[in-house]
Amino acid sequence: MRHYEIMIILDPAQDERTVAPSLDKYLDVVRKEKGNVDKVDIWGKRRLAYPIQKKEEGIYVVVDFTCESATVLEVDRLLNLNDSVLRTKVLRTDA
């Protein structure tokens, strides 16, 4: 298993208190595949460097987890299907 970090930018219209519960649905995919979610860090609403889907702000979330590569692809695919997710970026970290 490898260690990954995923940055997610969410639609700013979403309430910040509902971010963690809405992400649990996607992080359960990691847990079901015998992976481990190490840390979920919600940075909150920040200004974007450039507009994404005509939005000037976004809610930033960084998630550190350990799992197989196929699981990462599935989590990224599910996140991109969600309309409230503006952008995702997955990085494999050396941990």
Curated annotation (Swiss-Prot):
Q: Which residues cross the membrane?
A: none
Q: Which residues form a coiled coil?
A: none
Q: What does the record give as the function of this protein?
A: Binds together with bS18 to 16S ribosomal RNA.
Q: Which HAMAP family match?
A: Ribosomal_bS6 (MF_00360)
Q: Keywords in alphabetical order, please.
A: Ribonucleoprotein, Ribosomal protein, RNA-binding, rRNA-binding
**What GO molecular function annotation could you give as one example from this UniProt entry?**
small ribosomal subunit rRNA binding
Which Gene Ontology BP annotations are present? translation
Recorded GO CC terms: cytoplasm; ribonucleoprotein complex; ribosome
Gene3D superfamilies in the record: 3.30.70.60
Q: What is this protein called?
A: Small ribosomal subunit protein bS6
The family this protein is said to belong to: Belongs to the bacterial ribosomal protein bS6 family.
Q: Does the keyword GTP-binding apply?
A: no
